[in-house]
Amino acid sequence: MEDLHKVLKKEKYRKVKFKITKTQHLLIKAKINGVSGNFILDTGASNTCIGFESIGYFELSAKKSKTKASGAGATGMETQISSHNHLQLGSWKNTDFNLVIFDLSHVNEALKSYKAKAVHGIIGADVLLEGKAIIDYYNHYVYLQ
């Protein structure tokens, strides 16, 4: 697998470490507006999301949205949107990033029931697609270009 790293480095990919939790989720650190948080890396989530309780923590400016969110066993959830944020995973950056904000309490309650760490949000397919992501499950790295 070291060859994979060398090939991707030549293609200007950035390597970001993740951990596998007790619940088999991929846990990754990210910074939003310079503030570090814990996130689930979720290929099945269409958008990167933050919980309502983290609006102040990440210094987000939130606006109401007509879009309803669904996922992880919940549907029809109210959402807000936060535009023009700075997102960083390892050394990969996006300086004009939009986030969906919604109630993540059902996610964190499920994690707590397994004695797993609560998360601030979910890194979704929007980031993975933009970064042309390659996930190395064996070595626990996501590569972003």
Describe each region flagged by the PLM.
Residues M1-Q145:
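Pepsin/retropepsin-fold aspartyl endopeptidases
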